[in-house]
Amino acid sequence: VFTVHYPDEEREEGRPLRQAPCDDRLKELGAVFGQKFGWERANWFAPSKELQKDDWSFRRSRWFEHVGNECKNVAENAGLLDMSAFAKCRISGPGAEEFLDNLVANKIPKKNGRVNLCHALNTAGGVHSEFTIAKEKDNTFYLVSAGAFQRLDHDWIHKWMPKDGSVIYENLTNSMGVLVLAGPKSRDILSKITRTDLSNESFPWLSSKKINVGLAPAIAMRMNFVGELGWELHHPIEYQNHIFDKLMEAGKDFSLKPFGIRAMESLRVEKTYKLVGTEMSIEYAAFESGLDRFVHLNKGKFIGRDALVEWQQKGFKNKMVTLEVHDVEDADALGNNPIYIDNQVIG
């Protein structure tokens, strides 16, 4: 309690608790880990064993330069990120489609193999949760959300599930791993180890397919959170190291390197990709958070719709914008900082 707490501080007690199979491989490649909801996650990668630890500071610390290099490599070549900490579940049953349509503000995917980004609002019209929803087959959907909010998101699902048995929930968080391949050379890399056609025509944005990566089965989703060409590879977790090794081997000729959570955060902010708990929350209306294209008021009834319409009629007081901060040398705005104009807080 009586000590200095630094930005992005990671505490060591009780760790490691939950680990993905590829963690040992990531550590050998220089990973410096943090944790979310008990899961170890690679925050950044050090270039040598001597630098493979955090040095906490309110100013830029040793990871800043290396995270920048990770971002550059993803933007110019390709990067591999472990996101097995994602919260994952399957919703199925004769009432699954109707239930999910009421749970989220966006239209859920209607065709098998399609993927939509959907937001669950609370009853006041604020943003409670964000789900990636993939339709696997009739009455069967695969849901992915932030690992830090697994309990919150899955409790919300249970809160609104009908009690008549028409909807079945299956928690897949511990049984499914996720590796994210992203960057302009990601198609070249993945094409070397799968027979699936990865062209835009055959595998468009926001679609998913069952593929084989080497000898391992995976659900490949054409999407990612860093704004580059890429795929999320969701797989039975026992196949993870096989998939990881195949990708790293195939990527040698394309400058494939692992990247961590901090590089992902930097890249997603550049694209104004939002997160629940930072840019989105229950304190702000979905429209204030810039979710206009993800909220379909004309689709029919859904949780929070009427409250959101009422909020809209009264008028919004806030608007989410991306703020660029220039001429910074050794200390950065890390989020949740007040913004002043003429000594007045404006955001």
Give the ranges of each region predicted by the language model.
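Glycine/proline-enriched, intrinsically flexible loops and inter-domain linkers
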Residues: V1-G347
